[in-house]
Amino acid sequence: MSLIKNSFWNLAGYAAPLIIAIPAMGVIARLLGVEQFGIFTLFFAVVGYASLFDLGISRAVIRSVAIEQGNLAGIHSILGTSTILVAASSLLALLLIAGFNTTLVQWLSISPEYQADSARAFSILAVTLPLVLLSSVWFSYLEGMSNFRLLNMLRTLSGIFLAVFPLIGVWIH
């Protein structure tokens, strides 16, 4: 695929979710109020910084898969090993966040009326982190194979879901 086509898919992968996320965040902010929206954005930051538990493996997968193109056994080995390593490190993140969710809520000085919901939300966040980190490894496979069209279609969908699902959840709750 040409550089222009790959650039188009990369741009689309970031632009489409952004177009949906900006108004969705405005609505969520109005519905939640200042403190709850602050907690909500903190969770997005935690997901963003969760890449620390990736240990740089996703970047290594991109390079290794690109080098091993055509060697199916080598690619399977790379994906298997990286999946196991990231699953183990993300399990550590899950245990830390789930184990200290009430401590985190107290440390953040969250108002008493939001503490129970916030502790539950931290538990849900903890369970989703392994999925986020594993998807990063598997997206890296597509990037290493230079399958930018499929990669960015998936990124676009996941970005849209990250904007729309919280909006639906807040609207229903």
Residue ranges and their predicted role:
Residues M1-A21, A73-I84, Q115-A119, S146:
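N-terminal membrane topogenesis motif
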Residues A16, L85-H173:
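Hydrophobic transmembrane helix module of multi-pass membrane transport proteins
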Residues Q36-I39, T81, R120, L150:
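Residue-level recognition of membrane-helix boundary sites in multi-pass small-molecule transporters
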